[in-house]
Amino acid sequence: MLRRLYDWTMSLASGRRAPLALGAVSFAESSFFPIPPDILLIPMVIARRTKAFAYATIATVTSVVGGAVGYAIGAFLFLQVAEPILAFYGYLDKFEQFGARFNEYGAWIVFIAGVTPFPYKVITIASGATGLDFAVFMVASVLARGLRFFVVAGLLYLFGPPIRTFIEKRLGLMFTIFVVGLVGGFIAIKFL
């Protein structure tokens, strides 16, 4: 079953519409979607190494644009929905303190979240909700997302065939590691 799923992903990744799917997933992941674009970027680069940097560009640009939408969600919808609730429970002042602290380190928070597997959408929405300077947000987003996607694409470009062979020979192990990492990430987010 894993082999069929892998083969299907590889055929999808080398398909004509793969760049469009990558752009859509990258955009959505930055604002509301839970699946990281690496799920498509990695097999796409493995399937077509010569397009590695074009794919990284697509992922970066659409992710940053999606991040701007996430920022807008935080700036315009979060306060309309959450502010009355926070005020009702007496937490509005605590949120304002959180916002001040968040904005003090905002560029670093956005950058770190942008290069790690941490759900980037949480930070894009929080950046808008706390009023982080939009220019600071965008610069940190471009640098972080660009670094993340170009490093992944670059490594796969340089070491493509051996990595593909490694993945194909150890598909079960790779899937197990992925699932454990995914579940561990969700648990860490829930309890940290």
Predicted regions and their residues:
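Alpha-helical transmembrane segments of multipass membrane proteins
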Residues: 66, 70, 148, 181-185
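Selective transmembrane alpha-helices of multi-pass membrane proteins
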Residues: 80-105, 168-192
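Helix-coil boundary and interhelical linker segments in multi-pass alpha-helical membrane proteins
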Residues: 76, 80, 129-136, 190-192
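Transmembrane alpha-helix/helix-exit interface in multi-pass inner-membrane proteins
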Residues: 64-84
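Juxtamembrane non-transmembrane "cap" segments at the membrane-aqueous interface
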Residues: 78-89, 142-150
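Hydrophobic alpha-helical membrane segments of integral membrane proteins
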Residues: 7-61, 101-166, 182
